[in-house]
Regions:
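Short helix-capping/linker segments at secondary-structure and domain boundaries
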Residues: 56-59, 162-170
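Surface-exposed patches in mature extracellular/periplasmic domains of secreted proteins
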Residues: 140-144, 168-173
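Non-catalytic ligand/cofactor/substrate-binding and regulatory segments of enzyme domains
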Residues: 1-147, 192-194
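Basic/polar N-terminal segments that are highly enriched at the extreme N-terminus
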Residues: 1-4, 199-205
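Active-site nucleophilic cysteine motif
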Residues: 141-164
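Charged/polar, solvent-exposed surface patches and flexible loops
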Residues: 126-134, 159, 180, 184, ...
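Short terminal or interdomain "cap/linker" segment that borders an active site or interface and mediates
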Residues: 168, 174-203
Length: 205
């Protein structure tokens, strides 16, 4: 991965949806074919995102992934359900949020137009790392938060970027690609920031 020892950095990786997994990739293509037909547009390549953050505390990988086993060694800080809340009672239908010290991004070799440096500010890196356990954990693949888009791994990453104070709207997807769920994270982050603003103003008066 990209960052060198002794530096602070936030790097974004774009991975083709289902990299290394043929069934996920096929399902993604079917989903995009249907979405493109409904929206009367051309089909796009679909991408999943992950972050590598280097700060004073070390190097961390931040990603949402299936919770297929106990997560202590992967720095799991939160879990959520896949499909329905009831399904989440079974481990097979759970996802996990990782803040993994010295971790790895699976299939990083297949990343496209990556890494993308978002910041080299130490305070921003620390703030983003502190935010990871606070991320919302709605049901994956559903729009429980009423954003107009389903919540998924891209929502996690865009939420963190927005909440950490970086310019999330300037983050471009790979050429010819889409990142379903990206907008959902931004919408929720902006809502939370708007709610916090009046409280901050009142407290300073």
């Amino acid at each position: 991965m990209s960052s060198s020892v002794g530096t602070s950095a936030i790097d974004l990786y774009w991975l083709p949806l289902g990299a290394g997994g043929h069934s996920v990739r096929l399902n993604g293509r079917i989903f995009e074919w249907v979405a493109a037909r409904i929206e009367h547009r051309d089909r796009c390549d679909l991408y999943h995102s992950a972050l590598e953050v280097r700060g004073r505390e070390g190097r961390f990988v931040i990603e949402q992934a299936p919770a297929w086993s106990e997560g202590g060694e992967r720095g799991v800080v939160a879990v959520g359900s896949v499909g329905t809340r009831a399904a989440g009672r079974v481990q097979l239908f759970r996802y996990e949020i990782r803040r993994w010290r010295d971790g790895v991004i699976p299939d990083v070799a297949e990343a496209v137009e990556s890494p993308r440096r978002l910041s080299d500010d130490a305070d921003c890196a620390r703030r983003l790392l502190e935010l990871v356990p606070q991320v919302p954990t709605p049901v994956w693949g559903r729009d429980e938060l009423h954003t107009g888009e389903m919540w998924n791994s891209n929502s996690l990453i865009s939420w963190l970027i927005a909440r950490s104070g970086l310019d999330v709207d300037s983050v471009a997807r790979p050429t010819g690609g889409r990142a379903p769920g990206w907008r959902a994270g931004i919408v929720v982050a902006h809502r939370e920031q708007a709610k916090a603003a009046p409280a901050t103003t009142a407290g300073s008066g």
